[in-house]
């Protein structure tokens, strides 16, 4: 359909892995595949309806041609055939109109489902982001100068250094005064 080769597909997957990460990439792939399946289904519905409409139009044209040839001069067998064609054309028209009415409602429902699905996935993805990722996303939306980018990188390095010594579950930092009595006890034991 889009004439995408293996190399382009591989490049898209690598970029997706870098941008989304290994945790969110499968969710994004499933979401995109759902969209593609929905779009394919809608396209096949439209294609089938167009084919039926073309058949109906051809039948109507053949009926008009038969009427132009003076319907009374035809043999009784041909007149029966023309009547049958008219009846089948009318049946197809009513069936097509019913399907069109049903398709319009289902098309609107499918559009609403897609919108709801995209909103829910975007909400779950934002809920899954850690505060540092949200800060990073917020800062990447703005255009940053090289100096600002370097400053942000330094802040991130400092945060990593601090998080090594002060884990998230640790409410109070360990002060040097708490460490000194232990070293004095060790020195007393040596003496």
Curated annotation (Swiss-Prot):
Which SUPFAM superfamilies does this chain map to? Apolipoprotein (SSF47162)
Membrane topology summary: Single-pass membrane protein
This protein's source sits in the domain of life called Bacteria
Q: Where is the composition biased (Basic and acidic residues)?
A: 181-191
Which GO terms of the molecular function aspect are on file?
Answer: protein transmembrane transporter activity
Chain intervals with Polar residues compositional bias = 119-138
Function description:
Part of the twin-arginine translocation (Tat) system that transports large folded proteins containing a characteristic twin-arginine motif in their signal peptide across membranes. Together with TatC, TatB is part of a receptor directly interacting with Tat signal peptides. TatB may form an oligomeric binding site that transiently accommodates folded Tat precursor proteins before their translocation.
Q: What is this protein identified as?
A: Sec-independent protein translocase protein TatB
**What is the organism field in this record?**
Pasteurella multocida (strain Pm70)
